Amino acid sequence: VVVGDPDRQGHRHQRLDSSGQFRIPVNEVAVVSGASGGVAVIDDAEIEDAEAEATGALFAGFAAVVTAMDGNFVTAAIAIYIAGALDGMDGRVARMTSTESEFGKQYDSLADMVSFGLAPALVIFQWALRSMIEQGWIWSKLGWLAAFVYTAGAALRLARFNTQIGIADKRYFQGLPSPSAAAVLAGLVWFSVDHGLEGSEMWLLGSLLAAAMGILMVSNVRYYSFKEIDFKNRVPFMALLLVVLIYVFVTIDPPKVLFIGFLIYALSGPVITLVRLRKKRSRPAGE
């Protein structure tokens, strides 16, 4: 990363001085690629736009890790949900204000890896999977494996998402979004603790869900993205009513509603895919 002084004329567009040296204004940052020798100039405004919600989500993910290590699993689960809410706001605000930048995309992806890749895996491991050692040496390693499958799935999902920006159908996600996968694991922890269930009793379900969420994230199963709802223009009354109803249901019993809701969303992809395949196979040849 290179930060330079303004040129003599103060022109932001001028990159070379009279001696042919590359110069960067103080309010801009240059990212230099050692492999290609290319230089990408990023304005401070782009960094500020990306920092707000993404940094908040990153902090929430970090808080989830720290509180889980202290044994405060409900707080850790809530922190993951807060990270998800901030991440959703970040993307929505960027699309509404047309302030999406390359720096913002990369920074958001790194924050997502912490909040929805590492944090949920560590929370579910600390809460339930580490107790699998009581079942024997092999089972303890399977607990490690389940947590790693989830983490690797999140990393691959985020990398694939970055490479498909601009070419993928915005109506659908390819693979389960990492915030939704994280919400399923966080919901399991919060729901179980709220109902007096110990992690040592939930190790089997916890390991299965962790591995399943990791696999769904890297699958080709399509999930509806809800990006067609444009809040910049007129929003249908039914859409607003649905949002209000969702908030009402969540306030009734947050851990139960959030866990069941995100679990249904995670299962909706495979179910819809199987239904479509069945309909396709049942069609007569030539149609």
Predicted regions and their residues:
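N-terminal periplasmic "start-of-domain" segments of outer-membrane beta-barrel proteins
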Residues: G10, R15-E46
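Short juxtamembrane and helix-loop transition motifs at transmembrane-helix boundaries
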Residues: M69-T75, E100, G104, Q135-W144, ...
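Hydrophobic alpha-helical signal/anchor motif
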Residues: V1-V3, I24
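Topogenic membrane-insertion module of multi-pass membrane proteins
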Residues: E48-G88, I272, E287
